[in-house]
Amino acid sequence: MDYTMVATGPTADSGMPSEPGFINGGMLAREESAASGPVVVMDVPSIDEALQTVERLGGSTVVPKQPVGGMGFTAYVKDTEGNVVGLWETAR
């Protein structure tokens, strides 16, 4: 995944803001997406476990787990109502 970091202020080695009041993040080109608007992304301890739980409860995986730079992993799921939700797992 080609990911570009965006910083609005001073940044620590982790990519997080090193001073209060700034928002850092990143951008990537979306290839195909089931979502037509903004996507809520939730931080989870384990994407693998979250994907299993979503599927067990009737949801589906839209985009499987994939690395994002050296920062972590992302995946996208669809719930039983058709909402697409992003998952984020920080690399450890």
Whereabouts are the PLM-identified features?
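Short acidic/glycine-enriched loop/turn segments that link adjacent beta-strands
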Residues: 1-2, 34-36, 68-73
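Core segments of cupin and vicinal oxygen chelate
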Residues: 1-22, 56
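Short hydrophobic/aromatic beta-strand element in the GNAT-like acyltransferase core
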Residues: 3, 24, 74-76
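Active-site beta-strand termini and strand-to-loop segments that position acidic
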Residues: 6-11, 77-80, 90
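N-terminal beta-strand motif that seeds the catalytic metal site of vicinal oxygen chelate
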Residues: 37-44, 89-92
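Vicinal oxygen chelate
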Residues: 40-81
